[in-house]
A protein has these predicted regions:
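Glycine-rich beta-alpha junction loops
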Residues: 70-72, 142-144, 200, 229-236
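Active-site diphosphate/adenylate-binding microenvironment
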Residues: 19-22, 28-88
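Active-site-proximal loop->helix
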Residues: 122-127, 147-161
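Flexible, low-complexity linker and terminal segments
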Residues: 2-24, 33, 219-223, 228-295
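Short, hinge-like loop/turn segments at secondary-structure boundaries
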Residues: 82-85, 128, 153-157, 243-246
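Conserved thiamine diphosphate
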Residues: 26-29, 153-220
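Thiamine diphosphate
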Residues: 68-146, 209-213
């Protein structure tokens, strides 16, 4: 049983036990185009769509301002119709702080990668969270510097092969990965901290809810909110495009455990999230064994 939520693969060898539900396709109006310039199999467009859907669902489109980091996702500016400011590498949280303090009613968020946030700008996001700034930071974490061709970042997991860790990340030589969500959750100024993924449809749906809740936290002025989104990067991982989701689940997903790390004042440990994910995966597998999924 996979420890990743919705990890088990649906049984396609037998007829389904219940009829399929037709879901009306929905394309966020914020999306300016159906095209982007990212690699095939990249997970970042799904993360961008989750942000767009959350903003539209909450009616925050007109107040949204994005402080954009440096990375592959910088194409966000050409594909989503929101006001934005392009920031120096790692400095988006500080720029977002300035925007929020000058325009308190704006829905201010950052969009950054793991190289931008955790390597180049770790002090920026930690101090912003510690101050309890009423803004939202969104991290798209694929465990590599995608723009440079797949070099190790601070979030790369042990054993992960990158351009500069050909034999795999070694703790003795390269140090341990930084679990940024767990770090931020322990800061008093952080009100909501979650980690999602886009490696399957269920994960995308849960991640969109996390982004929505983060924006709601900001609108209530409860403090800093943070959502980490694990994304695929088959190009930077040097694997076939179709293997991206499974690779994410078996590498990043087994270390950067998904779930709500801090909500309603309660901090949840990695061990607690892992146990909950195992339980949910077992329940799902049991439902599949009984002949179908329950609502």
């Amino acid at each position: 049983v996979s420890t990743i939520p919705l990890g088990p693969v649906l049984d396609t060898a037998h007829a389904p036990g219940a009829g399929a539900r037709v879901v009306e396709p929905k394309t966020p109006a914020l999306l300016l185009t159906n095209q982007h310039h990212l690699c095939p199999g990249c997970g970042e467009p799904l993360a961008v769509r989750a942000i767009a859907e959350a903003l539209e669902d909450l009616g925050l489109v007109d107040t949204a301002v994005c402080a954009l980091g440096i990375g592959c996702y910088t194409s966000f500016g050409a594909t989503v119709d929101v006001d934005l400011v392009q920031c120096l590498h790692g400095r988006a949280p500080s720029v977002a702080t300035g925007v929020k303090r000058m325009v308190p009613d704006a829905t201010v968020f950052t969009l950054q990668g793991d190289g931008d946030m955790v390597n180049e700008g770790l002090q920026e996001v930690l101090h912003t969270a510690a101050r309890g700034e009423s803004l939202t930071a969104i991290l798209v974490n694929n465990g590599v510097f995608g723009e440079t061709g797949g070099h190790m970042t601070a979030t790369s997991v042990l054993g992960q092969r990158t351009k500069n860790t050909i034999e795999g990340r070694d703790a003795e030589y390269h140090g341990f990965p930084i679990l940024i969500g767990d770090l931020i959750a322990r800061l008093e100024g952080a009100a909501y901290v979650a980690r999602g993924s886009v490696h399957n449809a269920g994960a995308v749906a849960r991640t969109t809810k996390m982004v929505r809740r983060a924006f709601e936290t900001q609108r209530r002025r409860e403090g800093f909110s943070f959502v980490e989104i694990l994304t695929m990067c088959p190009t930077g991982w040097f694997i076939p495009t179709g293997e991206g989701p499974d690779y994410l689940a078996s590498t990043l997903g087994e270390v950067h455990i998904m779930g709500e790390l801090k909500a309603d004042g309660q901090i949840r440990t990695t061990e607690e999230l892992h146990a909950e994910n195992v339980r949910k995966a077992a329940e799902l597998e049991a439902q599949l064994a009984r002949g179908g999924l329950e609502d």
